[in-house]
Every structure is written in C-alpha cells, then in structure tokens.
C-alpha cells in the first residue's frame, strides 16, 4: 500500500498568519483514494530546512506532496531546494509555457523573464498543468537514492492546488494504487453519534474484510462513511453496498440519503414526488432556509417563494399575524410560529409552509426565553374541508449567532423532511 506525507511550505503558516487548509484538503482527497497520510509537516521558507524535511519524508513514505514556494517572488524557494536535494537542473516545459502566455496575454500584459520562469520544471519531472494560475506543478521520481519514491510539488494557492490534485495528481495515484476503493456516505439527521453507533453495532461487528465505517459529525447531522478497498471492483462495490444498505435499514428513521445527496436535494425530490409546493416564512434565520433550498438547481419547480419578517410589524402586515397574539405570547413562541406558517401558506398559494422565529443572540434573551431558543411552525393543506394541518415545536441551541442561525435553518429543514417522510410512508 502506498503511504503519503504532506509538507506545507511558508513562514506565514508557522507564524499563524495563515491557516493550513491545503494539508486538510489533500489528506481528505488521499483518504478517499485509500492512501493513508502518515505525517503532515509545516516548514519555513529556508532552503536548508526544506531539504532536510523532504529527505526525511522520502525516507518514510512512498509519496510526498508539497504545497507552497513555487511562485515568482524571493521567498518562493521550494524548486531550488529540490534542485539541490536531487542534484538536478531546470528545463522549460512547453505546455506550461503556453498556459503562462495565455494568461499573460489575456490580461493585456507583456511576457517577462520572471513570468517565463514559472514554466521551468525540474529535469525528469512530469509537469502538472496549472489551469488556475501560472506556476507549474510537477511530479518527480526521486531516483535510487530515495528508492524511486515520488515528490509532488504544487503551488500554495488553494484553488490552484485543488485543480492540480483533481486534474493530474489523483488520476496518477489511482494508476499506481492497484486497488479499487469505494466510499458511500449514509447521511443522518436528528440522531447523535453515540446513539447511532449503538443502532448499527451489529453491522460494525460483521464488516467484510477491507471495509471500514467512520462517523463524521457536523453541524447538519452525522454522516456514516462506508469505505471498501479491494483489488476487484465488483467485490468492492458489492461489499460496500451491502454495508451501506444494512446501516440505512437499521437507522431508517434518521437516514435521509445514501450517497452524495444533500438534505435540500432530498427534500426537493420528496416535494416533487408528492406533488407539493413549498413556501417559507423566516424571522430569526433571515432568509437562510430559502437560500439553502434555492441553492439547488431546479428548486423553482416546487419552491413558490418566501417572506423575511424580522419585525413584529412585518409579521402582521406580510403574514397577517395578529397583534394580540404577538402581545400575548411574544414573537418567539409556538403560537406565533404556527400563525406565521398559516399566513405563509395562505398568502403564497403553496401546499406546505414552514416558519422560523427565535433568538440567535447574543442579545434579545429574557429569563424564560434564552439565546438559542427556536420556535418552528409548519402548515399544510389537506384534502377535504377540515382546513390546513398545523404543527409546531420549540428547540434550544447552544452556539454563537452564526452557529445558531445555521442550526435553526437545519432544524427547519429537518421538520419539513420529517413531515414529508410521514406523508410519503402513509401513501405507500
């Protein structure tokens, strides 16, 4: 199995002036390819230190990926450090030169020697095209001194590194791995990591050889990543699908997707399948729920529109919420959330509406209504003449203003998903 190390170059990383997001991104991408990362190192711009770090890394790992220090400025010394380490020279890469010329001429500038130097690569390397910038990347076989191990050099600009990894480095890694790796996320909402682990313990106790399960909690829920590595693709796919399927059955009430689908995409599919249309009324989330829904292409087919009603006056004028209700219960209450959802339903023409009202913080709290309190309302048209179905709930979050708004929006989407799941199950 191929093992990797990541080396991030730059004094700015060691001084805390910049967060090393490149290393995290590369490690995640390699993990998905079944290549474990043994070590991540940050190194200064000094050539002597780079040579030492590169030499040690190549002594441990078959693949060393380096970001940073390939630009045209004086502190970009990575290429020189590699030249000295491997005792090689530079050569001009025609393909990289064309990329540089296209970018320079497109900006109406003249080609300079400094710009031309960005297309110089270490002798014997495979040049990596830079489709987002000018500095060429490269993949080098480091020769018998380092047991034919490989060094990958990429710029430190995240968008340039990302393009090189996806376009050249990862395909190159796949060609040499000799195995197939399959990843399937089982996405859940409304259940904690520990509870979820208890639910699927029987699956984890009987995993096929080469299959692992990882829990990935985040602000929106917990993803269970099922990973399978095998020499034969057919076996990898079969084992992976079997485990992902077993997990989704055991945790069915919390699973909203198996595979790379978002909660928003799942909800929109459910709305289409049940021939429903959606409208949203928001106070504390300030349009975030509607923004998340409309981030999905094709949402216009089921999303009719929304109301951002931050003040009490807006709630009264736009949604018809009673001033007496607001006075009696306050804006952050189940009663007002229900009235907001009903008003949204009636004034939008949609068949289902959700509403949010809460206290994101840091101010606005009262003794009985703390920061993080959220009231949700949902109204839905029903067949016959009995009027809309209305429900509400209260939740409490713990976070700063930004975190609370995100969690409020997630709670609203969860309420909508649960309502659609119930109606979908009853119609089967």
UniProtKB/Swiss-Prot annotation:
Disulfide bonds: none annotated. InterPro entries: CinA (IPR050101), CinA-like_C (IPR036653), CinA_C (IPR008136), CinA_KH (IPR041424), Competence-induced_CinA (IPR008135), MoaB/Mog-like_dom_sf (IPR036425), MoaB/Mog_dom (IPR001453). SMART domains: MoCF_biosynth. Pfam families: CinA, CinA_KH, MoCF_biosynth. HAMAP family: CinA_B. Belongs to the CinA family. NCBIfam families: cinA_nterm, PncC_domain. This is CinA-like protein.
């Amino acid at each position: 199995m191929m093992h990797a190390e990541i080396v991030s170059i730059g004094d700015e990383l060691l001084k805390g002036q910049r967060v090393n997001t490149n290393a995290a991104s590369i490690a995640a991408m390699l993990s998905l390819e079944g290549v474990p990362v043994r070590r991540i190192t940050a190194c200064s711009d000094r050539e002597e230190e780079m040579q030492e770090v590169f030499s040690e890394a190549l002594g441990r790992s078959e693949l060393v990926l380096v970001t940073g220090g390939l630009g045209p400025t004086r502190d970009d010394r990575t290429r020189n450090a590699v030249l000295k380490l491997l005792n090689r020279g530079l050569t001009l890469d025609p393909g990289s030169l064309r990329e540089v010329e296209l970018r320079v001429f497109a900006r109406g500038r003249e080609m300079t020697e400094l710009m031309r130097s960005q297309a110089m690569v270490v002798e014997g390397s495979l040049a990596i095209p830079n489709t987002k910038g000018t500095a060429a990347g490269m993949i080098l076989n480091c020769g018998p001194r380092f047991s034919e191990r490989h060094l990958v050099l990429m710029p430190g600009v995240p968008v340039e590194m990302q393009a090189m990894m996806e376009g050249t480095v990862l395909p190159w890694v796949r060609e040499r791995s000799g195995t197939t790796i399959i990843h399937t996320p089982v996405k859940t909402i409304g259940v904690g990591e520990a509870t979820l682990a208890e639910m699927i313990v029987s699956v984890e106790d009987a995993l096929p050889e080469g299959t692992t399960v990882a829990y990935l909690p985040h602000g929106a829920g917990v993803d269970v990543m099922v990973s399978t590595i095998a020499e034969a693709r057919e076996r990898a796919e079969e084992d992976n699908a079997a485990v992902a399927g077993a997990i989704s059955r055991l945790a069915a009430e919390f699973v909203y997707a198996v595979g790379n689908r978002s909660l928003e995409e799942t909800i929109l599919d459910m709305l289409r399948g049940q021939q429903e249309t959606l409208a949203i009324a928001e106070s504390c989330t300030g349009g975030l729920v509607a923004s998340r829904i409309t981030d999905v292409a094709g949402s216009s087919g089921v999303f009719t529109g929304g109301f951002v009603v931050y003040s009490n006056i807006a709630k009264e004028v736009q949604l018809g919420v009673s001033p007496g209700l607001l006075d009696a219960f306050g804006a952050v209450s189940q009663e007002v959330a229900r009235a907001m959802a009903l008003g949204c339903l009636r004034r939008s023409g949609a068949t289902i509406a959700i509403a949010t009202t809460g206290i994101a913080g840091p101010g606005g709290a009262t003794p009985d209504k703390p920061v993080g309190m959220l009231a949700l309302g949902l109204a839905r048209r029903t067949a016959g003449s009995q009027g809309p179905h209305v429900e509400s709930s209260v939740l409490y979050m713990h976070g700063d203003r930004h975190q609370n708004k995100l969690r409020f929006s997630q709670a609203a989407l969860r309420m909508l998903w649960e309502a659609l799941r119930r109606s979908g199950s009853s119609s089967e």
